[in-house]
């Protein structure tokens, strides 16, 4: 949506009645910065309608844009949009294009490193900034080996990855969210996993 190069990945998004966005994943905002965008603004009120006489006093025809209690489960909510506003005011909208494009390109570069190795494999080709992969040069069950590797990686604190299940098997999962990352970082992670795999 923000990247000219990768806009085609969201073909058809204009047909959605609403979309959820996590600005902290690819759009340089601190965690947690999320939004639900509605094609028809009034749908936000219908989705989270609640009945609280002491809070919700707007007349039926009034548009209470300022009353977030009508659009969420929480009555008191941090103004998350201020984080996005600050980024746009400081850097302009084009910063989002640059970030999204760079992060997807970085994921493709990381996937290339995995493809070029003979001891890792991808679960599937990344379409955005998330990769699922696993170490394959392990004795015994690969799911157990990769779960042990993930635990060892996190315990040492140099890198942070999670694990996920895909087709009943355990895979390592990483989200690339820092556009300053480089192929050297990804190579270091793979080497680190190789080293830890010997100890697991």
Predicted regions and their residues:
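Active-site C-terminal subdomain of aminotransferase-like
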Residues: 2-5, 9-117
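A generic structural motif
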Residues: 25, 90-93, 137-139, 178-182
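Short, hydrophobic beta-strand segments
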Residues: 86-87, 132-135, 172-177
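Non-catalytic, mobile gating and regulatory segments of ester bond hydrolases
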Residues: 115, 120-121, 143, 189-192
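Short beta-strand
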Residues: 121-126, 161-165
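Conserved PLP-binding catalytic core of the aspartate aminotransferase-like
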Residues: 122-153
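PLP-dependent enzyme catalytic core of the Aspartate aminotransferase-like
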Residues: 166-200
